Amino acid sequence: MLKYLNSTLSAAAIALSVGGLAGSAMAQDSAEPIIIPTHNWSSQVVMAYVIGGIFESIGDKVEYVPADSQAVYEAIRNGDVTISHEVWQSTFGASFYNAMQKGGIIDAGNHAASTLEELGVPHYVVEQNLCPGLPAWEALKDCAAVFATADSEGKGRILEGPQSWHGDLMPDRIKALGLDDKYVVKFAGSADAIWAELASAKKEGRGIITFNWTPNFTDADGFDFIQFPAYTDGCRIADGGDGSCGSPIGWLKKAANYKFPKTHPMAYTIFTKISFTTAQIGQMAALVDLDKMSHEDAAKKWLADNEAVWMPWTK
């Protein structure tokens, strides 16, 4: 299967090179590699290899580097990383704009997908009425015992993502809503740890509150985001508010080093055209989190199965 996928991609690369693009010579892209960061959630890593594969199809060189999901914007600004392809508004918007204000990083456009990053529960928790009143946040006041675990000190547990993602955003919210006497926020070490906990809870039929996001592979299984007080500008503690508000529906952007349009004009033009939908991003994540493929193999399969999506971006 992998041999077939590699052959498909090689054929695609040859077709692109012969079919009027003339590869990197016509684009006059630099021989220096495009540095693409990888973070710690599946869609981002698969998409890194998908975009890298598209760049390689026009003859460009690509390198992948692990990078902190907040500090990456400084790395792009300083030229250590070339692009960021999943800039989530709620989590990374502030870091992105702070870097832009300093100079050296540019906005390369939005994906078609809109985003939500929020606490929620698997749909069966609502469907089976394990906590009557969900997904309204007020229901949590009377359901702490449903979400208690061995490590939650008798309180309901809220499983957040790694603390590097949001800092104390969720603990601050729980405190502002007066729920801190009934719930404790625990930080997962990785996205994989969240998925493992969700799978375990589903198998046991027990209640669980976790951080999650859309687009993601969980969209297909059913996941209900808790309806917290509406987000408004300035509602978070960092912006002068009390921190009780939920998360906004946001954009999903792309960012690039300011030299990228000059050093790799063809690749940069392609990058500005790239726009993934919610379903496409969910598919990328599902190949890893459900089908248990490696990130690299998932990207090869996605590229082979979706030539009609990405090839037009190269023309």
What positions do the PLM features span?
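A bilobed periplasmic-binding-protein/Venus flytrap-type ligand-binding module shared by bacterial periplasmic
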Residues: 117-130, 250-263, 286-287
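Immediate post-signal peptide segment of exported/extracytoplasmic ligand-binding proteins
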Residues: 24-35, 55-56, 147-155, 309-315
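C-terminal functional modules
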Residues: 268-315
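Short, polar/charged alpha-helical segment
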Residues: 42-61, 174
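Short, well-ordered beta-strand elements
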Residues: 29-43, 60-65, 155-159, 271
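A conserved helix-loop-strand patch within extracytoplasmic ligand-binding domains
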Residues: 104-159
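Pocket-flanking alpha-helical
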Residues: 48, 67-103, 193, 197, ...
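Ligand-binding pocket segment of bilobal, Venus flytrap-like solute-binding proteins
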Residues: 81-85, 159-237
